[in-house]
Amino acid sequence: MKNLSVVTQFILLGIPHTEGVETMLFVLFFSFYIFTLVGNLLILLAIVSSSRLHTPMYFFLCQLSVCDIFFPSVSSPKMLFYLSGNTPAISYAGCVSQLFFYHFLGGTECFLYTVMAYDRFVAICYPLRYSVIMSHRICAFLAMGTAVFGCIHSTFLTTLTFQLPYCGPKDVNYYFCDIPVVMKLACADTSTLEMVGFISVGLMPLSCFFFILTSYSCIVRSILQIRSTEGRHRAFSTCSAHFTAILLFYMPVIFIYLRPTPSPWLDATVQILNNLVTPMLNPLIYSLRNKEVKSSLWTVLHLLCFLPKHL
């Protein structure tokens, strides 16, 4: 007869096939994590401290920076903890929390990128009505809506995952608790969860991505009609930064959750790109080609580090 004792903790087995390089990975991922936190905090300070950047586009960029601070913080501290030689165990409640906040923040970012694409669509396709359509009230409503939908999405998935009984093996063949690896340990039929997870985690980002592509097809058409070369260049510069960030976010998600045959090592590698590298690159993507952000950022660095006021 099977042992039906309830699992009270899980063992995170980490990134597959990385035995012997834990110290190197710890230094690398810790550097990524620190750069992510510092970069996004600087973007936040740059936007908040400059009245010129108090517009809908930068308001949503602020929200993205907040998400990019917390998103890698869901899995990175625990991963760094066991890479430094500590216990890889995580409590049942800790596993639930990881899964919930990962999908809450991931879902919020997914909806937020869609809202940001809509903002650019209105700004470029309907410039005369932009201030009316994207009023402060509408922006606050959209920002709150992304978080609410992200929370509903995550609550639904977390409830479905952990209403299953876990009474057998407790080794999670991954570096954090996510649906595909946790549900393999359930002592019950997981076909319903697999189907719902595929629809929610796979098709939901795909639907948002198609909406974004539709918005950008309209944006490109409108940009090509701009007579001013400088105007076209500025519009393309702003939109290309946003679209680059979108690709870096959506491609790993679609790759991981819509691929029919999972590979633990490949999935973990792509997931790290999504969890650590993309949030680290976002501040660079949004600041390098944006003179206003760079100027405000330099002012913040001057105040913090006593650097020269001008480049």
Swiss-Prot record:
Parts of the chain on the Cytoplasmic side: 46-54, 117-137, 214-237, 289-311
Transmembrane spans: 25-45, 55-75, 96-116, 138-158, 193-213, 238-258, 272-288
Main location: membrane
Disulfides per UniProt: 95-187
Key words, A-Z: Cell membrane, Disulfide bond, G-protein coupled receptor, Membrane, Olfaction, Receptor, Sensory transduction, Transducer, Transmembrane, Transmembrane helix
Top-level taxonomic group: Eukaryota
Cell membrane keyword on record: yes
InterPro entries: GPCR_Rhodpsn, GPCR_Rhodpsn_7TM, Olfact_rcpt
Residues in the Extracellular compartment per record: 1-24, 76-95, 159-192, 259-271
Any one GO CC term of the record: plasma membrane
Pfam families: 7tm_4
PROSITE patterns: G_PROTEIN_RECEP_F1_2
One Gene Ontology term from the biological process aspect of the record: G protein-coupled receptor signaling pathway
MF GO annotations: G protein-coupled receptor activity; olfactory receptor activity
Membrane topology (UniProt): Multi-pass membrane protein
Compartment annotation: Cell membrane
Protein family per UniProt: Belongs to the G-protein coupled receptor 1 family.
Described purpose of this protein according to its UniProt entry: Odorant receptor.
Name by which UniProt lists this protein: Olfactory receptor 10D1B
Organism: Mus musculus
Gene: Or10d1b
